[in-house]
């Protein structure tokens, strides 16, 4: 019975940004739940190993080139994905980037890189895929946000702006597309050890600092997202839309002491 609740057999999921890191973990979780995948990267050759890994799980994986900063690339990917499977059920908008600099050092190009990738790209990929979902009256769109969707951090101005925008965008699209049977939610990880931020975890004082503020006292590991992504992609999330699900070990509680240790 439990397996039936979260069974994605027969579903087709697009996961963007799957050449490495978090996108691959999310794709694995969906494949293990039974979904067939479309996997994307700016360099399609970078997807070969991951494609074989998904096929070894007994699922299909169609690799497609995608640059989320290029409108024509988005349209080509959406058309090719729909042609490959005949339908698209699930979209995981995972492709993203970051620039870590003091706000006074952020350049025009830095800002555009992050916002174009994380926010504009997220919208136009969702738009392109929704056009294929609407005729079928069904869809699950999961935008990958961050704890920075709800909190600001020094040195991350463009990233925080983009992820805050993702949260608001999620609510707007949920309102727009709900009548068509499409749910739109935001999955927002906290401080996770990923390739994108591995340099932070080489700094032991920083690790101690951040873990002290996480009630569960450890950074997230990518597999901590497995249950959340499968739930949001499944039939069991049918009445959940427009929401931001924080998977952050509790850091969003504020996680500061109101008492002093004796």
Task: Show the residue positions of the predicted features.
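Substrate-binding pocket helix/loop in short-chain dehydrogenase/reductase
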Residues: 102-103, 107-115, 210
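Active-site helix of classical SDR
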Residues: 126, 162
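Residue(s) in the substrate-gating loop at a strand-loop-helix junction
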Residues: 146
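Active-site loop immediately N-terminal to the catalytic Tyr-X3-Lys motif
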Residues: 104, 151-157, 179, 217, ...
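Alpha-helical segment proximal to the catalytic Tyr-Lys
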Residues: 131, 175-179, 238
């Amino acid at each position: 019975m439990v397996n039936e609740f979260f069974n994605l057999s027969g579903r087709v999921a697009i996961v963007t940004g799957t050449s490495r890191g978090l996108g691959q973990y999310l794709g694995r979780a969906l494949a293990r739940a039974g979904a067939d995948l479309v996997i994307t990267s700016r360099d399609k050759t970078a997807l070969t190993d991951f494609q074989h890994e998904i096929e070894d799980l007994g699922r299909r994986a169609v690799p497609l080139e995608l640059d989320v900063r290029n409108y024509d690339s988005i349209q080509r990917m959406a058309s090719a994905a729909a042609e490959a499977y005949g339908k698209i059920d699930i979209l995981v908008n995972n492709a993203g980037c970051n620039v870590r600099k003091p706000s006074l050092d952020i350049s025009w190009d830095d800002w555009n890189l992050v916002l174009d990738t994380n926010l504009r790209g997220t919208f136009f990929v969702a738009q392109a895929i929704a056009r294929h979902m609407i005729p079928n009256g069904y869809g699950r769109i999961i935008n990958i946000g961050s704890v920075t969707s709800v909190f600001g951090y020094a040195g991350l101005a463009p990233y925080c702006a983009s992820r805050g925008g993702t949260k608001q965008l999620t609510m707007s699209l949920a309102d727009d597309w709900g009548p068509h049977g499409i749910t739109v939610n935001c999955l927002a990880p906290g401080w996770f050890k990923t390739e994108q931020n591995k340099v932070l975890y080489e700094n032991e004082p920083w690790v101690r600092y951040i873990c002290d503020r996480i009630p569960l006292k450890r950074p997230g590991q990518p597999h901590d997202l497995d249950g959340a992504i499968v739930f949001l992609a499944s039939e069991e999330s049918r009445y959940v839309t427009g929401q931001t699900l924080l998977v952050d070990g509790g850091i969003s509680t504020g996680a500061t002491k109101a008492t002093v240790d004796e």
